[in-house]
Swiss-Prot record:
This is dTDP-4-dehydro-6-deoxy-D-allose reductase. Its EC number is 1.1.1.364. NAD(+) binds at residues 15-21, 129-132, 164, 187-190. The active site is at Y160 (proton donor/acceptor). The lineage of its organism: Bacteria, Bacillati, Actinomycetota, Actinomycetes, Kitasatosporales. The keyword NAD applies.
Length: 326
């Protein structure tokens, strides 16, 4: 479908001031949608930028509070065509380890409140940003969408993974019991302009960029052999909207085709910044799964564009960081 699928439609985006949510807001506004941008945490610069867009209305909402969510939907719902759910408590491996209870509690309450309101207020469709961390890791076999916890349910005390698993199960049950038109997107590691560069909590790419740009060595948790698939945030947004446009699959992996080790990634980051390689391994720190290889067959069928190569995406992200760092 063409961009006019979104022109004149009203789309509610949660986590609208966050990294992924703000990119959805910008792209939807550019494509002619009326955007209801829900947020909880103040981010003044992004807030001012989005408020200046022609078709964006910012609404502060505590998604963990059922009455607050219902109040927002009651006020906004008569015109909502689509919900894009990006809000989630997230962070790097250390953050997830230390705050698992808080993450699980926050994320499961948020998705429960949201899906109940989508049902009760008759919203036409919802896409949920899930996670590829749901899959059991294999260094050689790419995870297909049907290879998730339904095939291999396993115990974990990782509150983030548990919250995403709960969210997917609840979404499926809403689809089956209430007929909710819900889509689940499972991204690889998302990166790009606008990400948070807090090294104590941030994702791997912004953390590496911040340290390398400051002339510090990059610390890699583990031996650096763990591999990941990365996806530029703009590609994630475009692929998710294409999934809604086509309605082709209920779940879809979204990632770039390149699978790189964390050690290779560190070298790429140093190179795009023009820094000499200064890398230190710390085997005592948590590393997550050794591999997270994703099958992208569904994504290849759905999208109508070529995802950005990792090197080009890193160069763009590095330029953005150097312009906006403090």
């Amino acid at each position: 479908m063409t961009a006019d699928r979104w022109a004149g439609r009203t789309v509610l985006v949660t986590g609208a001031l966050g990294f992924i949510g703000s990119h959805f807001v910008r792209q939807l506004d550019a494509r002619g949608a009326e955007v209801l941008a829900l947020y909880r945490t103040e981010r003044p610069e992004i807030q001012a930028e989005l408020a200046a867009l022609n078709r964006v209305r910012l609404v502060r909402t505590e998604l963990r509070d059922e009455s607050d969510v219902r109040g927002a939907f009651k006020y906004l719902a008569p015109s909502i065509d689509t919900v894009v759910h990006c809000a989630a408590m997230d962070g790097n491996a250390q953050f997830k380890l230390e705050r698992s209870a808080e993450i699980l509690d926050s994320n499961q309450r948020t998705i429960s409140n949201l899906l109940n309101c989508v049902r009760d207020f008759g919203v036409g469709e919802v896409v949920v940003m899930s996670s590829s961390e749901l899959y059991s890791a294999s260094p050689t076999v790419a995870a297909r969408e049907e290879d998730d916890f339904r095939r291999s349910m396993r115990y974990t005390d990782n509150g983030y993974v548990l919250s995403k698993t709960y969210g997917e199960i609840l979404a499926r049950l809403h689809r089956e019991q209430f007929g909710t038109n819900v889509f689940l997107v499972r991204p690889g590691n998302v990166y790009g302009p606008g990400d948070g560069f807090d090294c104590s909590r941030g994702r791997v790419i912004p953390s590496m960029l911040a340290k390398a740009d400051a002339g510090e060595e990059i610390e890699i948790w583990g031996d650096g052999s763990q591999t990941r698939s990365f996806v530029h945030v703009a590609d994630l947004v475009r692929a998710s909207l294409r999934l809604l446009e086509t309605g082709k699959y209920p779940e879809m992996n979204v990632a770039g085709a390149e699978q790189v080790s964390i050690l290779e990634l560190a070298g790429m980051v140093m190179a795009v910044l023009g820094r000499p390689e200064r890398i230190r391994l710390d085997p005592s720190r948590p590393v997550g799964a050794p591999s997270r290889l994703l099958d992208l067959s569904r994504m290849s069928e759905v999208i109508d564009f070529d995802p950005q190569p990792l090197r080009a995406g890193l160069e763009e992200t590095a330029r953005w960081y150097r312009l906006h760092k403090r």
